[in-house]
Amino acid sequence: MKAAVIDIGSNSVRLMLWADGKVLFKTLKTTRLGEGTAFSPFLKAEAVERTANAVAEFALQAKTEGAEQVFAYATEAVRSARNGAVFLTCVKERSGIDVEVLSGETEAKLGLYGALGKSSDGGIIDVGGASTEVCFREKGELVFSVSIPLGAVRLFDLCRDDRALLQESITPYLNALNEAPKKLPVYGVGG
């Protein structure tokens, strides 16, 4: 069976088509859905339009390529936006697809499984556009997971080249990392 997943991030939308455990096709469009969310709790109308159009295009492409199922997931930009429901409605109207908004913890777990597979112990730091997820697994069990609402795009929009402001922005979240395991390998994920 062929299936597709559409990953709606704060900076880009990704499409991956697979069958029988093998990736057949991957592509990405930069839509900057989370543009401006460092200063406003609302998604910009232009960003909603760009991103909904990309999702509709990818849904059509997946179906044209023979995908029997198309799954779509959204992350921090939609999760934290006061008008996230407007975006979800727009996507549904244009593509016919219901988008699932992932919790920060689920996003972190999926990043961990994607980087480490089902059995390896270790952790990931997944820097997205609007959030950063940190997740660890030890002896097959999830032992730590946190989602921090600061990602590369959001921090750049907020701080630009101001290192003092950058430090001030991230310091409140550093204590959340104190409980993370210290002796496991850690892998960086992003993009």
Question: What name fits each language-model region?
Answer:
Residues 1-2, 68-69, 120-122, 181-184:
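Short coil/turn segments at beta-strand junctions that form active-site/ligand-binding loops
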Residues 1-24, 115-148, 191:
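Gly/Thr-rich phosphate-binding beta-strand-loop-beta motif of the actin/hexokinase/Hsp70
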Residues 60-89, 185-191:
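Short beta-strand-loop/turn "lid" adjacent to the catalytic site in phosphate-handling enzymes
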Residues 51-65, 173-180:
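A short, N-terminal amphipathic alpha-helix
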Residues 94-98:
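Short acidic, glycine/proline-enriched helix-loop-strand junctions
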Residues 100-124:
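Conserved phosphate-binding catalytic cores of ATP/NTP-utilizing and phosphoryl-transfer enzymes
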Residues 11-46, 138-165:
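Short glycine-rich, Thr/Ser-proximal phosphate-binding strand/loop in the N-terminal lobe
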Residues 157-190:
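ATP/pyrophosphate-binding catalytic subdomain of soluble kinases
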